[in-house]
Amino acid sequence: MIPGDIAAALGVRASGTWRPAPAGVGGAPGTYATSLAFRLADASGRVPGEVAAGLAAALEPVPWISAASITRGGYLTVTVTPEALAGLAVRVPAAGAACADSDALRGTELNAPAAADPASAASWDEARRRLAAEITGRLAAAAGAKVKVKDYSERWCHCGLPALAGAVAFAGPGAVRYALARTQPGRQAAIDAAACARNDLGNPFFAVRYAHAHAASVLRWAADLGLDRGLPETFRPDLLCHPGERELLGVLSWLPERAAAAARRRRPDAFARYLEGLAAAWLGCWERCPALPFGGRSAPTDGPQAAARLWLAAAAQTALRTGIGLLGVAAPERLHAAGSGGLYESPG
């Protein structure tokens, strides 16, 4: 989201050039680095450092950008204001299912297979390849590509691998789909059905869905207490200043870029790992600066700070629900972790 905002302020397409700023160059939430100047320099025959200087100068009058600097001969590092980063807490829920959308792949066309039962694949590798192509289609569509979904089932063997069918029967199709989706190309695709069926935070499939359900339960709990986020116009971005909140906002700010990058590289496993990082950021934020009191921990229960934290919970839930859906998996609103000792028990 934020990298797209910066590109829009420059009036250029910069998809595929953004990276988190490296340590030592302001690598904190709200700071972004781009190699855009090198791309533009190649096209124009100019020196990258000169192009980067022009880009930095163009950003000087933008009120929500606090700094733009040049490093390593042409890399542009941009820092947005804390208020701009915190504003994602309102922007993400407002965008809803479109919060992962961008125009990064606008003008691209591709075919993608319709969703199919993973148990019908003749091998683990075939199941992974099929699923990767299906998810890539959804990610590409979110990034602005024109995607034609086609039914290729007549080309596929329908006998199915017994081990795959057994894994689906034991762990469920969602768990198997997620485990295959996060498997890197070239790695053995066979999965441990028992491991991906565990209801604990050590299981990535459970963790991302649990984080979504946890954020949803926070919002339900707040409603039961009569608490309200209020209108977007009353939101106070300056109140989301805790390091845990800023870390979560920093991860949220990359959602459209991570979806587009995974589509471009045909690597849904990279997007699954992004979601796992987002889930961890939300649960870490809740532990360090909860939106509501729990387990003896204090938290504001009314006023603008409580409202700001509830907006952030809504942003986390919206982003997780959207991302999990792009992987073709359901995002439940009620889910409980086994053996969590209360720390991560659903608050409502």
What does each of the following model-derived ranges do?
Residues 1-348:
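Non-catalytic interaction-recognition regions
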